[in-house]
């Protein structure tokens, strides 16, 4: 109740109340990507990337001191974020950049032949690739909440409070040992193109000495091209954390009469940026020191419970997140190509519908069961394999 219905704390018995909770969460996140060039690594244009997420123990602490018409409460909990996930075969958005290399190699080889720099295209049969790819990410919001509840009448109470939110994100991964077939042999492309660059550079120097400026110019261009490919196929690593904090004002009200109880809570929009703390970023996606919008959207919750029996209660609830009012990281509009905040690709915000029942088995034991239906209402442009929402 400290989190879900803090205004209802006024109807507790006087005294100090403490709750320590632990939850476990295990999840497999499956991303299916279809891209024709993927067939060059495994023979299938559709690939499935599985992310294993596990949190064996997620703690939370809630405390209330109730005296007369007043109740003072506090809590510490993980209040948001997507948790942790490890993709041992990387992500499709990363592999897609590697998968087009064989086609580019064919075209580059044909250009070298047409320019008279090579007698035949060494990449004419290049149609396979391989890559060692890995990604691990975490997104967590830790919240410390403090507030006060006051009972106005025997039936009505109100709450006011604040939650300090600390965001901790982290991304770690690599793309390395990029290979492709030249003939029937798989070779490391970074080493191969570095060798071509060295060879063309020597030929350019020799042509310059021999008084063949046109040939020297062609070999210099080939050197630049091979050097560029060597750079594109070198091992790339990512190790970046993001942190930020913000304060959420919270208000609530609770109406309790007879067997009915109705609780309402509103959390205001939280202005928040996360700053990159980058150790390694060969991907150029997380420049050091850059701040990214990471607002926590305002939230309206309504809950209604009814006491069927003294030991049996049923409840329903509704949550609405005002996502469109929160500033978020940029995403690309898939129709126009424009980069803009992800909040512009959300229809009307997130809606959650809840229902549950709880039974007091005895004085010291209680069991409950419930369900939740979440509808995000996001457009395709909102989604990516590094940040997605699935209803």
Regions found by a protein language model. Name each.
Residues 1-86, 100:
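N-terminal, post-signal peptide beta-strand-biased segments of exported outer-membrane/organellar beta-barrel
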Residues 57-58, 64-391:
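Outer-membrane beta-barrel porins/channels
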